[in-house]
Swiss-Prot record:
Subcellular location: Cytoplasm
Name of the protein described by the UniProt record: Two-component system protein A
Phylogenetic lineage: Eukaryota, Fungi, Dikarya, Ascomycota, Pezizomycotina
Domain PAS: 45-105, 166-239
Entry-linked Gene3D superfamilies: 1.10.287.130, 3.40.50.2300, Histidine kinase-like ATPase, C-terminal domain, PAS domain
Length: 682
């Protein structure tokens, strides 16, 4: 009997064997007046089954083999004595034959439960000859006497007749498809069939390729690292595998292929794989062209913006330095007012240039933060001091900083200041009376207890935001305040940049109306680390608060002892930079008009110069090449890049290639003082 999927002895009504039960049944029939025909003795049955031309195994009710035919021994080559008195579950499936023992269990279970013949079809035996296994239960009344397993040889024409329609349909389908290579592999990966599409795509004729391993279609590198074999392993494990990659034709040319491999099973037995390949070379080339076009477009845009930045900043540099020196002279009130107008206009122009560059970097995804230690209180103080001069008469600007705010945190000080400066600057611009209040609070980050979330609110009593503009406040190029009259100048990029920067700092930005008066509340959050970090040994200097008076005084005493080499090709910038350095206190300043001249001067006096201020973009020899040649001399004096290039990564590139610091044009006196103090004062 089959219990829980296992073969066990079948119940014989508590008798020891089928013969005893047979005798009882015969006696019962005689007692009832029936005549029971005599049955052949076991030896007679044994001779019948042993001599039958059909390969046969006879099982008793306990599923133990009690007879094996000569024809079975001849077909399978298994000695009779090795099979007799053996449980059928201990016999190799190939000698029964069945694909596997579970299939045999199923057939025996079905035969014994239904008392009907069961057939396991198309079992491959020997030289790929298909057979059927007939499972016949022999019952007398309710008692199972025997189970007969017979192997039927299926002639080729019978199989062909059974599958003629399917084969013909498949053949027509596969052979007429020329856009796809469709072929079969045997279980070891050797090619078994080859359609017309495969011939067109791969260049092999059927007689040239059938029988060869499919790895011939892969590159030598793929064959060496075992990619074909791994593909079949994954296919068997996961049920299919799809891949894209280079495949090779007979003539050695390659094409970009999409490959799908599926395992083929027959009656639970793995018999091979079907492989479908299509040529995606045109799509791959189109994708490559699109990527190249996108990269070229991005490069051209980057180059254009870099050029625009350089071309605008270079003349602005001369204007800025000349204006700085002009304001140090004895100007009348009217002249000073005119100078302030020029200064304000230059600041606005520079802000527009910076906004366009920042927006370009943010929209392209090429913007990144620079983590460093920062002091929020110091940054807020610097921004407030910077904005006080622009306040309308009577407008108050105050701050409220939570005492729980950590003194030192880790973040990007430049970008935090940029967002804060923008929000406070907007409040100053749009508030004509009343007050502006800056509030800073912090809380522990819920996901990282070592970090803090800093919330910055700027509340004003200005003109407020109309309801129609609320949904587009943080959209690029959106301007709502008196746009027709253009009373308030700007690009409409500021708040959009603030939003992007806040999100880069793992925060957000938002707006709400002032709950206590007319005006607005703009806020942003930023995640700040709490643990200290070691700043890089070299990093580009950034503008900050005004240089203290004592620093300028100290520099004035240090400068006369220092020898400076100024390398600048623009005559205006060269002239005003020389004058600016003189106003700081430097007396020994040499000038070079290009990198080649600078290298020559350094080579003549290698130990003379204490610092080199080097323009980057120059004729004959640019600043980076000149720096490389100076470093090759073994000289380590500070080389400061003075550049109109302000794209993301420019300063880091200059430092990586041997320079020590970077100042972007237009050069402000305080910015130059800060850098010089960094290298001389400490």
């Amino acid at each position: 009997m089959l219990l829980n999927g296992q073969i066990s002895a079948l119940s014989l009504d508590d008798n020891d064997n089928g013969q005893q039960h047979q005798d009882e049944v015969q006696a019962k029939h005689q007692d009832q007046g029936h005549t029971c025909p005599s049955r052949p003795s076991v030896p007679s049955l044994s001779r019948i089954y042993r001599c039958t031309p059909v390969p046969t195994i006879v099982l008793d009710a306990s599923m133990v083999i009690i007879e094996v035919s000569n024809s079975h021994v001849a077909l399978f080559g298994k000695p009779r004595d090795s099979l007799l008195h053996t449980s059928i579950s201990d016999v190799s499936p190939e000698c029964i034959p069945v694909p596997n023992i579970p299939i045999l269990y199923g057939a025996l279970r079905a035969a014994c439960s239904t008392r009907e013949i069961q057939v396991v079809e198309h079992v491959v035996v020997g030289e790929k000859i298909a057979h059927n296994l007939r499972v016949t239960p022999v019952y007398e009344d309710e008692t199972l006497l025997f189970v007969v397993l017979e192997v039927e040889n299926l002639r080729a024409e019978v199989i062909n007749n059974q599958h003629a329609y399917m084969n013909e349909t498949y053949k027509i389908l596969v052979d007429t498809v020329k856009d796809y290579a469709i072929f079969m592999l045997d279980p070891t990966g050797h090619i078994a069939t080859w359609n017309a599409g495969a011939g067109v795509l791969k260049g092999y004729k059927a007689e040239e390729i059938i029988g060869k391993h499919f790895s011939i279609l892969y590159s030598p590198a793929d064959r060496d690292n075992g990619k074909p074999a791994r593909a079949l392993d994954v296919c068997l494990r996961e049920g299919r595998i799809e891949d894209e990659g280079w495949r090779y034709r007979r003539d050695g040319s390659r094409f970009w292929a999409n490959v799908l491999i599926t395992p083929i099973y027959q009656f639970g037995q793995h018999v091979g794989f079907v492989k479908v390949t299509r040529d995606l070379t045109e799509r791959k080339e189109a994708e490559a062209c699109m990527i190249a076009a996108f990269e070229e477009s991005s490069r051209l845009k980057t180059d254009f913006l870099a050029n625009i930045s350089h071309e605008i900043r270079t003349p602005m540099n001369g204007m800025q330095i000349a204006l700085t020196m002009l304001t140090d002279t004895g100007l009348s009130e009217e002249q000073r007012e005119h100078a302030n107008i020029v200064q304000d206009s230059m600041s606005l122009l520079l802000q527009i240039v910076n906004d366009v560059l920042d927006y370009s970097k943010l929209s392209s995804g090429s913007f990144s933060l620079h983590a460093d230690m920062l002091d929020i209180r110091e940054i807020v103080g610097a921004v407030v001091r910077n904005c006080r001069s622009s306040l309308q008469e009577g407008v108050e600007l105050d701050t409220e900083i939570s005492p729980k705010l950590p003194t030192r945190m880790r973040g990007d000080p430049l970008r935090y200041r940029q967002v804060l400066q923008n929000l406070v600057g907007n409040a100053v611009k749009f508030t004509e009376k009343g007050s502006i209040h800056v509030k800073i609070t912090s809380s522990t980050d819920e996901e990282d207890s070592d970090s803090s979330v800093v919330r910055t609110e700027v509340t004003d009593t200005g003109i407020g935001v109309p309801d129609s503009a609320i949904n587009t406040l943080f959209t690029p190029f959106s301007r709502f305040a008196n746009s027709a009259a253009r009373k308030y100048q700007g690009t409409g990029l500021g708040l959009s940049i603030c939003k992007s920067l806040a999100e880069l700092m793992d925060g957000s930005v938002g707006y709400s109306p002032n709950p206590n008066a007319s005006g607005s509340v703009f806020w942003f959050t930023a995640k700040m680390g709490g643990r200290s970090v070691t700043p890089p040994s070299k990093s580009p200097s950034v503008s900050g608060s005004p240089v203290p008076t004592e620093v300028a005084s100290e520099m004035r005493s240090i400068a006369p002892r220092k020898h400076v080499l100024l390398v600048e090709d623009n005559i205006v910038n060269h002239t005003v930079m020389l004058k600016l350095l003189h106003t700081i206190g430097f007396q020994r300043i040499d000038g070079a008009w290009n990198g080649a001249e600078a290298v020559r001067m350094v080579r003549q006096k290698p130990l003379s110069y204490d610092i080199i201020l080097m323009d980057v973009s120059m004729p004959v020899l640019d600043g980076l090449a000149a720096t490389e040649q100076i470093r090759d001399m073994g000289l380590t004096m500070p080389i400061i890049a003075i550049t109109g290039n302000a794209m993301k990564g420019d300063a880091e590139t200059y430092i990586a290639q041997g320079m020590d610091d970077c100042i972007c044009k237009p050069v402000h006196r305080d910015q130059l003082l800060r850098v010089l103090w960094k290298w001389f004062g400490t």
